[in-house]
Amino acid sequence: MSAFSYTIMCNFAHNQLFLRMKKPLKRITIAVVSALLLLLVAGSFFMTTYALKAHSNRVEQQEDTWRIMSERYPDLKWWFDSVRQHRALNDTTIEMPSKYRAHAYYMRAPKPTTNTAIVVHGYKENALKMLHLAKMYSDWGYNVLLPDLYAHGLSEGEYIQMGWKDRFDVMRWSEVANDLFRSSTANSQQVLHGVSMGAATVMCVSGETTPSYVRCFVEDCGYTDVWSEFKSELKNQFSLPAFPLLYTSSWLTDLRWGWNFKEASPLEAVKRSTKPMLFIHGGNDSFVPTPMVYELYKAKKGVKKLLVVPNATHARSFAVANNDYKNTVKQFIEEQN
């Protein structure tokens, strides 16, 4: 056998061996990629369910809230007990344009007035968690409306909307509040006050065209956008980067519920806002990182004010600096009337 023929035979044998090895290698590669994709999809389903699934027993949660509020604000326990005993909170339920039943509590001022506060609760909480602020406004002679957001409290719904689609519901509640509290000669004069996700909600409302009776907004520890908030939580709670899980989870949320994490942006809404806004944040907030409030404040054009409470963690500014909180809010809203 010549050297040339031997070389040809060796090359042929090598190629055959390579082809035989290539097929299982290809199958292994496909299997690994498929497994990774399935794991990613499963992780995305878990994340969206973990982050957006409503409280499993919201009726039981309502009962617990009375106890929690009394423990959190012991100086106000007497008022909470009085409100409950005398049934000072009225219930109202309406059908939203999206065809779900939404619930709210409302309380009339001690004396007839058109001054009205709509106070919006936070993530996985309910309207009763805003009773401390309801008392604050009631003491100032305001009517108060406390809505349960979609998939919270006594409202229908299974998955949380992080304040984004909730903006339309709060705008509807604003109309309801005006019907409830306007006088025979004048509309109500409303302040929209939100805490945490509720703050994100009222900021999203501020970017829409609102009636003249909506006078101003107070946002307490709201986030810049859902993407940034979830990115922060992925890092802090799970030590995970944004890629790829946050991307696929946002896509899955869009597929299932028609919105994504980046478009749900209070920051972009604030840029469009034309009405006065008070920004409040805890100086030691790690859940919604404190630097977010500076970005929001900078983006707001027109009348604005900022209160950062030193040492306050998430949604604890009212408890940590009670007098400063109340004085700042009162002065701000009085300046808008």
Where does each model-flagged region fall?
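An N-terminal hydrophobic leader/cap segment in hydrolases
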Residues: 37-95
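Conserved alpha/beta-hydrolase
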Residues: 137-156
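Alpha/beta-hydrolase active-site loop
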Residues: 160-181
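Hydrolase active-site cap/lid region
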Residues: 204-259
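Short beta-strand/loop motif that positions the catalytic acidic residue
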Residues: 273, 279-281, 285
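Short alpha-helix in the alpha/beta-hydrolase fold that links the catalytic acid
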Residues: 275, 289-298
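Catalytic histidine-centered segment of alpha/beta-hydrolase-like enzymes
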Residues: 312-322
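Catalytic active-site module of serine/aspartate enzymes centered on a nucleophile-bearing elbow/loop
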Residues: 321-337
